[in-house]
């Protein structure tokens, strides 16, 4: 999963995104079936929504009710639990900072952490905006509480996350999940089938 791998599938997501959670269940296996790896890139949709004038899908009248039904249906299709945490939506700032702290040490460990965070949010319905929950997950994976506390308050990691969001905006990422495959953008969990076909054909 080397960040420098030119043919890697890039996976942008917000930890607060239900569709990001669903995509996280499938994207690694999908990419691996085509000999590709995945670069996981957590971002924050809040600053992006300020740019686009959007808001969380579940907060949109009429559309939000359908989206909740669709998320539950998609979760049943791939056989994973889904529970909407409260409060929702939530800010995943701490969870994202810890991801990049881990990423710079061990990319595989960062991805393993991301999957646990998603499960805590959307299977256990826990509030991952709380530093205590983020710390607990990292502790469970073998990291010391003092390391986690330091990382959460590290100004360099704060800037790192801001920079990742700015890069995403520059690349015209506007939602979660969002993918780049050979430079081609794909938005949404419902584009995984298109990504699969794109990788089979080599594009079209």
Model-derived features: positions:
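C-terminal cap of thioredoxin/glutaredoxin-like
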Residues: 4-10, 16-36, 112, 116-204
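Structural alpha/beta surface segment adjacent to cysteine/selenocysteine redox centers
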Residues: 15, 19-121
């Amino acid at each position: 999963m080397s960040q420098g791998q030119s043919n890697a599938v890039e996976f942008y997501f917000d930890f607060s995104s239900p569709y990001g959670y669903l995509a996280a269940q499938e994207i690694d296996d999908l990419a691996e079936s085509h000999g590709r790896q995945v670069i996981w890139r957590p971002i924050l949709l809040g600053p992006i929504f300020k740019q686009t004038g959007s808001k969380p899908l579940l907060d949109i009248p009429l559309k939000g009710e359908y989206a909740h039904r669709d998320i539950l249906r998609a979760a049943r299709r791939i056989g994973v639990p889904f529970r909407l945490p409260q409060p929702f939506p939530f800010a995943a700032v701490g969870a994202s900072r810890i991801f990049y702290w881990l990423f710079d040490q061990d990319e595989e460990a960062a991805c393993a952490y991301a999957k646990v965070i998603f499960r805590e949010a959307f299977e256990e319905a826990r509030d991952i905006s709380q530093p205590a929950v983020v710390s607990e997950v990292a502790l469970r994976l073998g990291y010391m509480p003092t390391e986690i506390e330091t990382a959460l308050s590290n100004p360099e990691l704060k800037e790192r996350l801001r920079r990742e969001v700015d890069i995403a905006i520059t690349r015209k990422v506007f939602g979660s999940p969002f993918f780049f495959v050979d430079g081609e953008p794909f938005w949404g969990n419902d584009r995984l089938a298109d990504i699969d076909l794109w990788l089979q054909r080599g594009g079209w």
